[in-house]
Amino acid sequence: MSIVTKSIVNADAEARYLSPGELDRIKAFVTGGAARLRIAETLTGSRETIVKQAGDRLFQKRPDIVSPGGNAYGEEMTATCLRDMDYYLRLVTYGVVSGDVTPIEEIGLVGVREMYRSLGTPIEAVAQSVREMKEVASGLMSSDDAAEASAYFDFVIGAMS
């Protein structure tokens, strides 16, 4: 739920107008809209590069997962790992656009640790893959945009820790 919707729902529940503080938060949200869209466009337009480079970095740092017996061993399992990375990158873009972590949490993080545990997938490797995407993506943006996007990557990483 965006800051706009949250503010309206809260004010309406109390049968009142929006407060000056709520209006200020909405103004900041609207003012930052162009930056959030620019970040989302960068992430979306560069998704293949981000996932590929981050995957390469992950596999160099964690050769155990692409070695025989590893969860990303073999072409099919490596593709599955990269698919999952792409999914988390997409969730980050949802958070960036909405200016809120709620879509990330509600769409894709509920039960994620339990799911990976049941599959025998090392959750720390999944978290590392998101860290690698954050690093690659940050290199494609201005420092301000990278700082904004980092909060959403960090939220995903934190949910896996």
Curated annotation (Swiss-Prot):
Record Pfam families: Phycobilisome (PF00502)
Gene3D superfamilies for the chain: Phycocyanins
Topological category with respect to the lipid bilayer: Peripheral membrane protein
Transcription regulation found in the keyword field: no
In-chain residues carrying the UniProt-annotated modification N4-methylasparagine: N71
Similarity comment text for this entry: Belongs to the phycobiliprotein family.
Record protein name field: Allophycocyanin alpha chain
Organism: Synechocystis sp. (strain PCC 6714)
Taxonomic classification: Bacteria, Bacillati, Cyanobacteriota, Cyanophyceae, Synechococcales
